[in-house]
């Protein structure tokens, strides 16, 4: 398609945000009512059904309709007023809510900041080692300020602890047998719970 029209210029994205207003013949701060009135007037004048002999009328009508669609949508209009047609393109690609973030990250100071941090950290290699890998999988991590005590339990001490726990459990025998249950038995009874056997 580009080979057929070598003299046709590729349309560039503007950042001024004025060309849609110029299509409708309005100034940049026009109200919604002015936009609607002008759109109706121009749409009737350039409608393809009213101008069947003029092939450019259909193209002009599409431009007018596109300008009206964008300028009557408040979020698209705010993006267009602030960033121009480039902002609308970014909104299509990344969403309306991410337009400000895109332009902030593509500003000169953000790019400069990324380059400086990248150079200072050795292409972010230091950040990766310190934050992600904790310097060689934890071998070089900084020592904690509180010393960790060595905790060792001998098998004899462990056996003695188990024996004393079992003896304590033998002091309180089970006096109630479990009740029969079926599918309709509730797992948790209504009312107060009692874990005491003295009742």
UniProtKB/Swiss-Prot annotation:
Subcellular location field: Membrane
GO terms under cellular component: cytoplasm; membrane
UniProt xrefs under InterPro entries: DnaJ_C_subfamily_member5, DnaJ_domain, J_dom_sf
Modified how: Palmitoylated.
Pfam families named in the record: DnaJ
Chief subcellular location: membrane
Domain of life: Eukaryota
Segments forming domain J: 19-84
Residues modified to Phosphoserine: 14, 16
Membrane topology: Lipid-anchor
Keyword terms, alphabetized: Chaperone, Lipoprotein, Membrane, Palmitate, Phosphoprotein
UniProt subunit comment: Interacts with the chaperone complex consisting of HSC70 and SGTA.
Protein name as annotated: DnaJ homolog subfamily C member 5B
